[in-house]
Amino acid sequence: MMPSFCLAGTLMMALFLSSLRPESLDPCVEVDSNTSYQCMDRNLNKIPDNIPSSVKHLDLSFNPLKTLGSHSFFNFPELKLLDLSRCEIETIEDKAYQGLHQLTTLILTGNPIQNLSKGTFSGLANLQNLVAVEIKLASLDSLPIGHLVTLKKLNVAHNLIHSFKLPEYFSNLTNLEHLDLSNNYIQTIYYTDLQTLRENPQLNLSLELSLNPIDFIQPGAFQGIRLHELTLRSNFNSTNVMKTCIHNLDGLQVHRLILGEFKNERNVERFDRYVIEGLCKVTIEEFRFTYANEFSEDITDFDCLANVSAMSLANVYLKRLEDIPKYFKWQTLAVIRCELKQFPPLELPFLKRLIFITNKGATSFPEVNLPSLTFLDLSGNGMSFRGCCSYTDLGARSLKHLDLSFNGVISMSENFMGLEQLEYLDFQHSTLKKATEFSMFLPLEKLLYLDISYTNTKIDFNGIFFGLTSLNTLKMAGNSFKDNILSNVFTNTTNLTFLDISKCQLQQVSWGVFDTLHRLELLNMSHNNLLLLDLFHYKQLHSLKTLDCSFNHIETSKGIMQHFPKSLAFLNLTNNPFACICEHQNFLQWVKDQRLFLVKTEQMTCATPVEMKDSLVLDFRNATCYVQKTIISVSVISVLVVSTIAFLVYKFYFHLILIAGCKKYSRGESIYDAFVIYSSQDEDWVRNELVKNLEEGVPPFQLCLHYRDFIPGVAIAANIIQEGFHKSRKVIVVVSRHFIQSRWCIFEYEIAQTWQFLSSHSGIIFIVLEKVEKSLLKQQVELYRLLSRNTYLEWEDNALGRHIFWRRLKKALLDGRAWNPEGATEAENNQQETTTSI
């Protein structure tokens, strides 16, 4: 029974644990440590208990909270942003937000709130931004926010509001800057609706009324009203309604007026000049007109807008824009995506900023006269310039900002004469011609920003950037250099702080390229073909903070890693084919040690060897190299030892045989008195002199001679050792010129040395048969040294010399010989008998 009971308990526990949702255990994601938590869409029906009191940003959106009880967030006194979007909240009890004194942003979007009592928003002493979009709000009166005196932005868009009447409590909201009433059901605007604003002229309110179906504005409704911004987009269902309503804006003072429609909300079929004429009684500082399909040809009469400081036309279909009077006080003109067929010939003495972008119909730049112009943006038009760039080409002497990016072919024929005030210059994604034929930027000593990225420029002239002594930002990505080598083109740009040379097909970097860029903070060399990370190139970049070498062909580094500038904070080496081999062990270990300093080390993968392909560089283990080094070291040492032994065995094979023989014959008696080593060229002397005087003399000596005593059929070397050395007491070495030149003689002599060492007594007798030149004798170093230090016999072919020679030789041979008196007497008698008979 017990096992069954345990099994049932285990199954019940498993079922219980499986029924728990993961989010119920740890429902929120910690975005920033103890300050930001994301609990979106976790099926929560209450505030989680495990959120710390230090939280500042809390996202509870898309959870079925249903109800917010009193003091729901009392535990989060540091909270600054609270997102309760689409939490199905129907009821918010009084003091629900009590204790949130630091809260600045509250988002209630998409909650079907049934009732908002006076105490709903109590406790929000510092609230600045309230988002109450799509909460089924019927009127502004039902929103109890009169006490939120710190409120700056109120967004009640997409509700059920029909009346534009601003409640009296707005007079308390003295800090309110933006009111968004867009996408409601406001149809009419009356004079009394704005009475609160008239009574509180200190308000500087921006009012968003777009997407309300306005069909009537009471004449004079905006009389005496001053606004920072008024936006009316896609409000009118016909041209006539729009004209009437615009005319009834008379008396309004507004800093910025925005009219028009949205891209996907087009109601007005055609715009004519009467729409613009309705603005003559409105005081406007800036005017923007957006998204208009059809414009009458006579709408170019902008006299009612002559005194605005900024004029903007965006996505307005204009066939032409010309004949703008000189007296217009426009300081800014922006024409954006208006499909103009040609650039307007402008002559506006007050104009300071001209933005003419993405108008694909205008392909050339006409003559203009804009003496006050400081900002010119002509990007994205597809224009071509046959000659550029000087004052006569652009009609402006005071230019500080020039943007010619995303255009066609720009032929550089002049070096910006008359444009010496330029501080910003952008050519990116236009095609530059003749850019490297001369120092085209030479007069631009004040230029701070230059972008020639993707201009099809091949840089083969080191003086291209001469004159740019103040430049701090240089972007030249997507171009190329001669022979794909980064040359010394930055010697004059000593104030650079930002340099982008990515996608330039670079394979090498010349020495000293960056040596003058001591202020450089960011260097982008990504998407090139560099093979090595050569640290010496960056040694002089004392201010460098960011280096991007990603997407190259870098396998390892070159140089000492400490040569990196100490100021460097971010290094990106991702997407390089690293070689994770022991040869690069130091670099790979450095990557591990600097993982916090390197960008996205988890994306740094190995390309080689095959077994580590696509594995992380961080997974490389140094222990593998130590094992391999140990194996290699042991293998090398073993091979060396075996080779040495083999060599020694080969070289001293006969010496070893001699040693073995010495052990074998050490206890036996010698057969011969001496083994004679000599050259075959000296054999006559050996037979006629040496043998005759020693073997036939008194006392007689028995010599071992190879021609007489060696055993036939046995190897010469074996005979030398076994018959010569092992069976002889002494060794006689007959030294001559022939002896020194004979390899066999030298071999026999070396064996004799070993034999003498093993026998532990002086057993070698040297006979110098003839005078031998020292130079020849020195070829055999050991023999020369031995003859220099030891006594030897020298053959002299005269009576006295012979007598002394034979006496000394016999005495040497008798040394160590066992004495036999009878044998000696018999030998002496035999010698006397022989003499008598003769």
Curated annotation (Swiss-Prot):
Record domain LRRNT: where: 26-53
Tissues/organs with expression: Expressed in macrophages.
Protein's UniProt keywords contain Transmembrane helix: yes
Secretion signal, residue range per the UniProt entry: 1-25
Record topological domains on the Cytoplasmic side: 651-838
Extracellular side: 26-629
TM annotation in the entry: 630-650
The LRR repeat ranges on this chain: 54-75, 78-99, 102-123, 126-147, 150-171, 175-198, 204-224, 226-235, 372-392, 398-420, 421-442, 446-468, 470-493, 495-516, 519-539, 543-564
Keyword Transmembrane helix among UniProt keywords: yes
Subcellular location field: Cell membrane; Early endosome; Cell projection, Ruffle
Membrane topology type: Single-pass type I membrane protein
One term of GO molecular function: identical protein binding
PTM: Phosphorylated on tyrosine residues by LYN after binding lipopolysaccharide. Ubiquitinated by RNF128 via 'Lys-28'-linked polyubiquitin chains, leading to proteasomal degradation.
Glycosylated residue positions: 34, 115, 172, 204, 237, 307, 492, 495, 524, 572, 622
Disulphide bonds in the chain: 28-39, 280-304, 388-389, 580-606, 582-625
Cellular-component GO terms for this entry: early endosome; endosome membrane; external side of plasma membrane; lipopolysaccharide receptor complex; perinuclear region of cytoplasm; phagocytic cup; plasma membrane; ruffle
Pfam families membership: LRR_8, TIR
GO BP terms in the entry: astrocyte development; B cell proliferation involved in immune response; cellular response to amyloid-beta; cellular response to lipoteichoic acid; cellular response to mechanical stimulus; cellular response to oxidised low-density lipoprotein particle stimulus; cellular response to platelet-derived growth factor stimulus; cellular response to type II interferon
Chief localisation class: membrane
UniProt function note: Transmembrane receptor that functions as a pattern recognition receptor recognizing pathogen- and damage-associated molecular patterns (PAMPs and DAMPs) to induce innate immune responses via downstream signaling pathways. At the plasma membrane, cooperates with LY96 to mediate the innate immune response to bacterial lipopolysaccharide (LPS). Also involved in LPS-independent inflammatory responses triggered by free fatty acids, such as palmitate, and Ni(2+). Mechanistically, acts via MYD88, TIRAP and TRAF6, leading to NF-kappa-B activation, cytokine secretion and the inflammatory response.
PANTHER family cross-referenced by the UniProt entry: TOLL-LIKE RECEPTOR (PTHR24365), TOLL-LIKE RECEPTOR 4 (PTHR24365:SF521)
Subunit structure: Belongs to the lipopolysaccharide (LPS) receptor, a multi-protein complex containing at least CD14, LY96 and TLR4. Binding to bacterial LPS leads to homodimerization. Interacts with LY96 via the extracellular domain. Interacts with MYD88 and TIRAP via their respective TIR domains. Interacts with TICAM2. Interacts with NOX4. Interacts with CNPY3 and HSP90B1; this interaction is required for proper folding in the endoplasmic reticulum. Interacts with MAP3K21; this interaction leads to negative regulation of TLR4 signaling.
Protein family (similarity comment): Belongs to the Toll-like receptor family.
Name of the protein in question: Toll-like receptor 4
Gene: TLR4
